[in-house]
Amino acid sequence: MLCSLLLCGCLLLITGYAHDDDWIDPTDMLNYDAASGTMRKSQAKYGTSEKKEVNPGLSDAQELSDCLQRLDSLTHKVDDCEKKKMKDYESQSNPVFRRYLNKILIEAGKLGLPDEDRVDVRYDAEILLTRQTLLEIQKFLSGEEWKPGALDDALSDILTNFKSHDAEAWKWQFEDYFGVDPYNVFMVLLCLLCIVALVATELWTYVRWHTQLKRVCIISFLVSLGWNWIYLYKVAFAQHQANVAKMAPLNDVCAKKMDWTENLWEWFRISWTYKDDPCQKYYELLIVNPIWLVPPTKALAVTFTNFVTEPLKYIGKGTGEFIKALMKEIPVLLQIPVLVILALAVLGFCYGAGQSVPMLRHFRGPEREPPRALEPDDRRRQKELDYRFHGGAGDADFSYRGPAGSIEQGPYDKMHVCERDVLRQRQVNMRFPSGNKSPEVLRAFDLPDTEAQEHPEVVPSHKPSIVNTSLKETSELPRESTLAECSQCAKDGSGQVPSTAESSPIVEKAQLKTDSECRPHSTEAAAAAARGTDPVSSPCG
């Protein structure tokens, strides 16, 4: 028994020395193969690492060379260890990133990957970062010991809610934050800018409010015209699409060619029934565009109708609700008197508004007064003003050098004209009794109305003197003196200066025969031309 134990011990020692190379070093994790449970042998040997016994007979140079060889072998071993470590590091990290990129491609493939039509596609995703994920990423970046499984799970949980990129997302965020659509905010700011511009530039002071109101109404009507046309077109298009959907069963019936039996049957159907041809309606829907169903006249009619009836509709609706709420608490017997009182109140309001229109005239803006009707004495003055339109301020006798118009004058009109001319001559003689030069008076159309009536400006001139006076002064003078002056005017026009004794019968004759002495302008002008005198100087015209 003892001998057998000794024999087994010797065999174990022998086998131990025989398999010295297969000894497992528990601290060497680089050369350990976990699958086979043995140590991997090094592929290259750069020298003997065993410690050799120092031979005392060797020189120092040989010892130095041996040390350098051993140092070189150790350096190569360290490099090999680093390379193996890097390979293991890369071999462990590559699968992690491969799975991460594969997940990104899978999520993007659900939304659409770039192709020939779309060179680049934008996506949105949320990044979820936890504390454990942050620690694993920091270990990996710093080169510390890390676990591939933990890093893979961390990267897989980072990207969440993968979706396509929405360029209008900021609008929704703006609306969620402020509760208002960005377009409405922009329009309000634009209106405020317009108001500020009107106030700053004082443009509103140059345009009256009633003019602005009319322009706003016109612009609103024009905008509503296009607005209603688009609305009617949309409605017609929707109705057209609905009719096309209803005609879908007739696609095969109306599209195929008919043989002689079907043509015969169609002829009998048309001859014996009043039903419309469904294929005709089908082809009308296919050929006629809905845009031709909405002419501009229809849009204009709808716009005008809405422009007038829509306000009345809301007024009637409000009135009906008011009457309904008023009658709800009133007994049935009192409802009729209340309605009568309301009707009388409305009529009274309308009557009062009609009576207050002249008081509110200034709210309607400036209005031009109608031209005043000309009296008989003003006809010649109006003719002179019309004829003197092209004359200047110094053309005193310009208005008497031609016919003033085609208005016929009666005997009373001629008499009033003669009276006015006599008064003009009298005022000239009173204000300028001596001197060869006669004054020239600016007429009413050369000065403002008030200045021409109150302070006529006198300018010296060689032309005949004519003074414009108001018609009121003409009507206030006595008729006898006017007729006498008219006779004297006739004598002065003929170029003769009679004596005092001869003037009295002429005055009496002028009082009896006013029409004969104050002749028309054409007869006296011809007589003056025959005598060689200027017809302009005749005050009787």
UniProtKB/Swiss-Prot annotation:
Task: Please tell me in which tissues this protein is expressed.
Answer: Expressed in testis (spermatocytes), liver and lung (at protein level). Expressed in spleen, liver, testis, kidney, heart, brain and lung.
Q: How does it sit in the membrane?
A: Multi-pass membrane protein
Q: Where in the cell is it found?
A: Endoplasmic reticulum membrane
Residue list for modification Phosphothreonine: T482
Residue ranges annotated as compositionally biased, kind Basic and acidic residues, are: 364-381, 511-522
Task: Check the record and name the Pfam families matching this protein.
Answer: MCLC
Lumenal side of the membrane: what ranges? Answer: 19-184, 239-329
Q: Which reaction does it catalyse?
A: chloride(in) = chloride(out); bromide(in) = bromide(out); nitrate(in) = nitrate(out); fluoride(in) = fluoride(out)
Give the UniProt entry's GO cellular component terms: chloride channel complex; cytoplasm; endoplasmic reticulum; endoplasmic reticulum membrane; Golgi apparatus; membrane; mitochondria-associated endoplasmic reticulum membrane contact site; nucleus
Keyword vocabulary terms for this entry: Chloride, Chloride channel, Endoplasmic reticulum, Ion channel, Ion transport, Membrane, Phosphoprotein, Signal, Transmembrane, Transmembrane helix, Transport
* Positions marked as site (Ca(2+)-mediated inhibition of channel activity): D25, D181
Membrane topology, Cytoplasmic segments: 206-217, 351-541
Superkingdom of source:
Eukaryota
Q: Which family does it belong to?
A: Belongs to the chloride channel MCLC family.
Q: What is this protein called?
A: Chloride channel CLIC-like protein 1
